[in-house]
Amino acid sequence: MAGVGAVSRLLRGRRLALAGATRGFHFSVGESKKASAKVSDAISTQYPVVDHEFDAVVVGAGGAGLRAAFGLSEAGFNTACLTKLFPTRSHTVAAQGGINAALGNMEEDNWRWHFYDTVKGSDWLGDQDAIHYMTEQAPASVVELENYGMPFSRTEDGRIYQRAFGGQSLKFGKGGQAHRCCCVADRTGHSLLHTLYGRSLRYDTSYFVEYFALDLLMENGECRGVIALCIEDGSIHRIRAKNTIIATGGYGRTYFSCTSAHTSTGDGTAMVTRAGLPCQDLEFVQFHPTGIYGAGCLITEGCRGEGGILINSQGERFMERYAPVAKDLASRDVVSRSMTLEIREGRGCGPEKDHVYLQLHHLPPEQLATRLPGISETAMIFAGVDVTKEPIPVLPTVHYNMGGIPTNYKGQVLKHVNGQDQIVPGLYACGEAACASVHGANRLGANSLLDLVVFGRACALSIAESCRPGDKVPPIKANAGEESVMNLDKLRFADGSVRTSELRLSMQKSMQSHAAVFRVGSVLQEGCEKVSQLYGDLQHLKTFDRGMVWNTDLVETLELQNLMLCALQTIYGAEARKESRGAHAREDYKVRIDEYDYSKPIEGQQKKPFAEHWRKHTLSYVDTKTGKVTLDYRPVIDKTLNEADCATVPPAIRSY
């Protein structure tokens, strides 16, 4: 800590007079004794720049980031964890329903059945090697959380309680509804995040709290760390590391109505894009069936898992018509589309007939109080509804991004060169920021928290396999990160005609109206033009705060740049994909287009060439100067990690 203190005194001694700054800079860093830092004048004389060196740096401190960070520290790596929020403010805290694992506490279960359901739920766009890894690791991951102290809800005999959730079955879809979702009432994400944060405090990890990651530090195709802004004092920090893990979450705030926190701005996704690397499958955006009408707040799928039902204005349990077997527990894309069709056909509820109802008041009050206490409170606050007496008005709301940074099942980031996958040295991703792809075209409920802990741990294990603590950290150029500082300075003094909030709202409303639950070519084309125009309007931004101390105006503008890159790739990918698959439902291309017609026996059929079918991953790139989007494609991985232990699930017609 003596070295850190010396740097702090040096920074304070310089008394840099930045416009709007009213106090000296305070250099804040994690309390690790292993932290090293020194002041650099290589890329800016206007902004204080501090260089650090670690074995590994994790960007993001939600469930995935924390699990990766303390996994590395536990293995002896000198680890930094950089986050724009205090860890327990991360969006993982908002997850309600639970975490899937085939524990078999309610009935016989098998992780291979979970594997089957996840592949089917992905509409056969998920990579089966990664799905194999995740579902096989699920039971041990939940037991690990229990050992960390996570207070799971319990059965009467003391085992972890498991509820029913959408798209989950027994015996490869032939044995009825599975009860596979482990939960802590309806506050599972809150409990998981606090459990992981508490566990992380056992280890010597350096936390850089309220630091905004600006860009990756890339050298010769390798990632060698990140450059970040300290929001507290405006200092710039280059964190050099042999390995970098991106765990920054999703980009739900590209849409007007969503369940995501305002901080879900796709920061990691955008950093990868600016580094010239691809993003994968961003057109697949999950609409959760039950957001509170008018507010967008999440009402967990656990409500339907506990016996809640969706009804229309005629009091009809309409899901029986769309999914005769699973009914209200069909997969999320199926339920969201069914609700939208009910509203379109005039059976919506309310004066405007523009929503449906989620009915819970037929359930015992004691069940609502013990299994769904948070929902009872949320419904009263945001809808004015007493769930023991009235139904909750609900509407599909943007909830999750299936796409993200392409990785393999070890968390290593991939690029696609000459038709082949290549690993990007030194770069990993996990959580919602990543696309492994375990969710494919549609994520099953309660697989997201599982994704976080399984692949956060996988990143740490993968690094421990290939590196050793104290390995030499590769050098970076003296001016590495210079462009990031220039961009920050440009935005800080931006004096155009458009407020950040105005441009952000225009983007969100455009995405909401042009790339919603149902999509059509002409509307998507119009959306592409509109979002491209809005991207161009970034040149006309006006920021008002010229200071550097807690400049939230500047941070929101940096976040808007990130959101725009995500929005561009989402809508261009959606316009190009001329089929319906999972969460991507085209009204002008209503069927799934595979290499074979799986509604018929494939014997005698000729396999479609790769260019003529859509069972493939979209790879998107953006020229950040012009906003031009370029698309490429890579094949889906159908083989599991061990065919003898877990057989591939061949594509089939998907019904519930």
Curated annotation (Swiss-Prot):
The UniProt PTM text for this protein says: Acetylated. Deacetylated by SIRT3.
The transit peptide is at 1-34
Q: Single GO cellular component annotation?
A: mitochondrion
Q: Which InterPro entries match?
A: FAD-dep_OxRdtase_2_FAD-bd, FAD/NAD-bd_sf, FRD_SDH_FAD_BS, Fum_R/Succ_DH_flav-like_C_sf, Fum_Rdtase/Succ_DH_flav-like_C, SdhA/FrdA/AprA, Succ_DH/fumarate_Rdtase_cat_sf, Succ_DH_flav_su_fwd
Q: Which GO terms describe its biological process?
A: mitochondrial electron transport, succinate to ubiquinone; nervous system development; proton motive force-driven mitochondrial ATP synthesis; respiratory electron transport chain; succinate metabolic process; tricarboxylic acid cycle
Where's the active site on this chain?
A: 332
Keyword Plastid part of the UniProt annotation: no
| Cofactors that this protein relies on | FAD
- In the record, Tele-8alpha-FAD histidine modifications are located at 91
Q: In which pathway does it act?
A: Carbohydrate metabolism; tricarboxylic acid cycle; fumarate from succinate (eukaryal route): step 1/1
In its UniProt entry, what is this protein called? Succinate dehydrogenase [ubiquinone] flavoprotein subunit, mitochondrial
Protein source organism: Rattus norvegicus
Gene symbol? Sdha
